[in-house]
Amino acid sequence: MNISDIRAGLRTLVENEETTFKQIALESGLSTGTISSFINDKYNGDNERVSQMLQRWLEKYHAVAELPEPPRFVETQTVKQIWTSMRFASLTESIAVVCGNPGVGKTEAAREYRRTNNNVWMITITPSCASVLECLTELAFELGMNDAPRRKGPLSRALRRRLEGTQGLVIIDEADHLGAEVLEELRLLQESTRTGLVLMGNHRVYSNMTGGNRTVEFARLFSRIAKRTAINKTKKADVKAIADAWQINGENELELLQQIAQKPGALRILNHSLRLAAMTAHGKGERVNEDYLRQAFRELDLDVDISTLLRN
């Protein structure tokens, strides 16, 4: 691909509103000014270097465009179950806990709920932001408070002022990383602002507060949990809904998908298998079938050059 072809390819994408200079800059590592000047043949710098970077961007763009489009979001039975808890917490201004094994769809359900509802804010806790200050800072950024205070006391007060009267919902994903001090801070924030709060994570997020593991530290929080939703495994109805979204309805294929969904990682592994199977089938001009699904599930554990699948 010569420089003229690269310029023409980029110009076509921008003129057809398939992308923007800003998006190309973000994904290529170049500035918007450099890209604009290069496309218009007015760049005075190293055109060879820029053309190589933009050629790599173009190749990746077209490779992604060739991939079969997966369903954007599938509203499964488990999703509805999670949404019910979120609505309850929001409407009753209370605390709900959603816990379950990895890969059952908790995070995607929460993201979609945030996307389709007003005043819903979601943060994901990592070990590096599990302290009171870091957790509250993460929440402040999610709320658009980019100039928020950097000390716990002032930050907590600023968050209370921001959340009061919003009738909103705060979702804390991976809340099992949080200790008693942070959870108590979130409880007080929820109580004072009368917003809903959903703590979401693995079963430890709930077991810390119950049974033999419950301590005095967690007692006040536990007594204020209004609703608990535990998702132990993938439901058959979830797998059927996902298969329908992918237009897969063969009996053998459905049975295999049910088996895959029972593996560790559940729906996450299922969706990876479906995407890889769809890529392989698409590259051969065929529909996804049992053989492609089995091959995809095996290859997820192997060293496979994915880029070759579309060329076969």
UniProtKB/Swiss-Prot annotation:
Disulfide bonds: none
A GO biological process held by the record: DNA replication
Site (R-finger): 224
Main location: host cell
Subcellular location(s) per record: Host cytoplasm
UniProt site (Sensor-2): 268
EC code: 3.6.1.-
UniProt name for this protein: ATP-dependent target DNA activator B
